[in-house]
Amino acid sequence: MRVLGLISGTSADGIDVAIAEIQGFQADLSVALLAFETIAYEPSLRDRILEVAAGFPLSVAELTALDAAIAQAFATAAQTLIQQHGAVDLIGSHGQTVYHQPPQAGQLGWSVQLGWGAAIAQQTGITTVSNFRSADLALGGQGAPLVPAVDLWLLGSDSENRCVQNIGGIGNLTWLPRRDHPDWQSEVRGWDTGPGNSLLDLAVQKLSQGRLSYDDGGQWAATGQIDQVLCDRWLQEDDYFRLPPPKSTGRERYGWQFLETWAAELDRLTAADQLATLTEFTAASIVNNYRHFLPALPDRVLVCGGGLHNQFLLQRLQQQLPTVKIASTDDFGVNSQAKEAIAIAVLAYWRQHNVPGNLPAVTGASGPALLGDVFART
């Protein structure tokens, strides 16, 4: 089946669109990437998304208008690739996350992804699966991360323990134990590790007065000095790093509010030193999760997402994990930039075939669930 996956991460850089040929289901799952492209949002739409994600108040009318505008952008992105690469049988659309509230104190969590699935189905004329997180949340789960259910079939190993580390706006991991014993599937874990590129990108935008949106290759940060005392304070004073999994987070915690809270301390540093320290914090937060919550350090970390291109960040990760091999998912057959969109395509494919898409051991849900609402063109 040819399936098109759509997703835009918390950084809202653009819409990732992947077309994949999918066969099999789990142990026999086969995914061949046929096409991939990231299609940028119109600047005004991206600005509105980032305002909402930062907590900017909206009326219900404004929120529904934004939902429709994002759906239009997603549908247009899908049609662009379909025109270039041929028809597809199914669309999976994650939408644009603008808020995520994990469950707490016995209350169900909730998560808001904009991009109306029914509108995408109507505009494209193709059955569309969307709203993937709500079924897991309704079962008491975090609703995130969902990608580990796909990672375990595409990136596991018979000979080594692996971590798949996505570094998007937020960092998240999938722990993949060696598959050479009968219970390995039940030991797969995954959760959000904390900041990915979110704090770095926001700081770059501020320090460059809007001229830059990210630190290309980490080159700016690499010229600075790390304020280890400040980095250690962030790690010690943030209770998220002491919270055991399952857990999830978002830009609500690691966004503008974080930078504003620590503005006095950051402003005492040069621009390069600020970026070096924020880069170290991102790397250290990932390693902190490994050391505190994994059964052992992985033999190999497979990195994906935009952070893969930040060489300074990867150097800091390697320095803190000297015995661990660090590679890209590209090296093991999964396109590192298309990986999230591929996963959404697989989740939609599973939903269409009534295969549960969550891992309760990962999300904390009380049981497996069919993920996503299905919208057929009427």
From Swiss-Prot:
Protein's UniProt keywords contain Kinase: yes
Family matches, as Pfam families: AnmK
Keywords, in A-Z order: ATP-binding, Carbohydrate metabolism, Kinase, Nucleotide-binding, Transferase
Catalytic activity entry: 1,6-anhydro-N-acetyl-beta-muramate + ATP + H2O = N-acetyl-D-muramate 6-phosphate + ADP + H(+)
UniProt xrefs under Gene3D superfamilies: 3.30.420.40
Pathway: Amino-sugar metabolism; 1,6-anhydro-N-acetylmuramate degradation; Cell wall biogenesis; peptidoglycan recycling
EC annotation from Swiss-Prot or TrEMBL: 2.7.1.170
EC main group: transferase
Role this protein plays: Catalyzes the specific phosphorylation of 1,6-anhydro-N-acetylmuramic acid (anhMurNAc) with the simultaneous cleavage of the 1,6-anhydro ring, generating MurNAc-6-P. Is required for the utilization of anhMurNAc either imported from the medium or derived from its own cell wall murein, and thus plays a role in cell wall recycling.
Name used for this protein in its record: Anhydro-N-acetylmuramic acid kinase
Annotated organism of origin: Synechococcus elongatus (strain ATCC 33912 / PCC 7942 / FACHB-805) (Anacystis nidulans R2)
